[in-house]
Amino acid sequence: MENKTEVPRGGRRQRSRRPAADASSSKTEDKRQRMTPRKPRPIHRPWTLYAPPRIAEDPSVPLAASTFRFMSFNVLADYLVINGRENEPAKHHQKYDWEYRSVRLMKEILRWSPHIVNLQEVDHFEDFFEPRMKKAGFVGVYKRRTGENTHDGCAIFVKKSMFRIVSSHPIEYHVLDHPVLDRDNIALTAVVEAKNSVGGPSPARFVVTNTHLLFNPNRGEIKLAQLDMLLKHLTSLRKEHNAILPVLLSGDFNLAPHSPLYHFLSTGKLDASGLSRYGLSGQNLDTYALKKAARVNENDRTRHHGNGTAFGKFDSYRAQRDDFRVYKPNTVYSHELDFASAYAQLPDDKCTGEPKFTIFHSGSKATVDYIWYTRSSLHCHGVVEMIPAGLLFKHDELPTTEHSSDHLSLVADFSLR
């Protein structure tokens, strides 16, 4: 007799039911659902073009032979994340976990298809960044900070199909018996050569520099000394090569756009007579008005309006007490590098045109990261914009599950003149 499957009334086959889960498996499933975050999506950041050599909004469009993409990114050192997070709710722990963050940091770097990358706060160079970047076609150099209790540093990577590192030059800001240069901050400089130079008999060379200056907002005289040391080194390096090499300088400068130190970088001159160390970096400015404006107006076009004053207008930073003055109160500082800031747009008598934020956490919501370039020898074609301030204020702070650093990356396209 032929076996037939009995079909219940209605003509539909009944589905077998799973046995009821016991209490322990139910708890495990609930815990798994709580601990598994939704798949993060990258936050949209549009390009702003300064010149029309290519369609920057479409990263698949190939760059011209003489054009390259530069990225600077403070990746938030793992050991700094761990410190001070013990009392936070458990639901926040995963976004600080290195295995979780490391994957998303690499996605952020490779997302923009850069050719040269400067990273700050790198404390997993040999076991993570170097092998991962090598796999992506990069070669790099690294300099760790000099302190016994500091485990991070600066790294420079270049796409080896386009560039080679001719030489690298670490700079230590700690100088024995110096009255001010007594901190463990560092810089790293590399002379880079383009492999396929166009328009010249010899390969084009330029200088790439990465730095992370002191954070302390009250010790501006230390930052001024560090900055002065770095700029003198760059000037000397250019002379050693018997050429006016183009310079790209980026990093976490821990100074605001309205500050005397920003004025020094952008104009090449600073009269430090009587300036207060408390105000040199501009980090102590009350940003309440900026925060309020950011909440009210989320228009992308206002991203670069609201930070800073016009160049030179920092009279409020004059010292009121002798103990706040810089260690060389009558010194006029200068450099001849003729820097322009890649992100400064439409500066006027009220603002420098820098973004409102490049860092966003509970301790600081400000612009402290920059890409500087020698305007006579490099041309900036455009930049990737910051996340709108109104959107950032919807988060308590960075990092989030979508963005794994408390800094935003800076990305710009350049060509040699």
Regions inferred by a protein language model and the residue ranges of each:
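Short, acidic/polar
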Residues: D97-L110, K365
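Structured beta-strand-rich core segments of catalytic domains in phosphoester-bond hydrolases
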Residues: R38-T67, K107, I116-F215, R219, ...
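Short coil/turn segments at secondary-structure boundaries
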Residues: N83-N87, P131, R145, S168-I171, ...
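Metal-dependent phosphoester-hydrolase catalytic domains
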Residues: E2-E57, D228, T235-L248, F253-R417
